[in-house]
Amino acid sequence: MRTRLSIAALGLFLLQACAGMNSLGALIQPPRFEQVPDQPAEIRMAGLNGAGVRLWTRVTNPNPFGLRLGTLKGTLYLEDAHAADADFPLGLALGAGSDSVIPIDISVSFANLPGLGGVARRIIGRQPVAYRLEGTVGVDAGRLGQPVFGPMTLVRGDTIVR
């Protein structure tokens, strides 16, 4: 009888410990993304049918512990028109409270995207183009888990044409 009671108590203790670990994972804050003020996003023509977009992004870890930025899956919008999908394995280590500037490069094809005709004209005319990157971000926080945050707007701003 004592053995069964001990096993039941141990099982209850382990269940509470597992529940505690899940609540610890909920304490992880998502990394923050922002356009780098002195490095505007760039669009470069890639022939007549497309362009390359480089988003200079500052990624900040708001947590009091280090983590690894694992994945970024998103959708790029140019002037509110769907322009491209992106899926990056990043592997960027961010220390507690630290930040890093990374370029996010995305290729856009005008051939398959009729909604981008106006965007193409703005690019050819070397006019600024508004962008936003929406998506999800996966992090590896070691024993605290591997949460995925989003969907959310990761970064937005205006591009310059080079």
Model-derived segments and spans:
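Bacterial N-terminal signal peptides that target proteins for export
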Residues: M1-I7
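Bacterial Sec signal peptide processing site at the extreme N-terminus
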Residues: L12-V36
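Edge/loop elements at the starts and ends of beta-strands within beta-rich repeat scaffolds
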Residues: A26, A46-A51, P64-L67, A81-A83, ...
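Post-signal-peptide N-terminal segment of Sec-exported extracytoplasmic proteins
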Residues: V36-T75, V139-A141, F149
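Hydrophobic core residues within well-ordered beta-strands of beta-rich domains
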Residues: A51-L55, L72, S100, Y131, ...
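Intrinsically disordered, low-complexity Pro/Gly/Ser/Thr-rich segments with frequent PxxP/GP/PP motifs
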Residues: D80-G115
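Terminal connector regions
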Residues: F110-V161
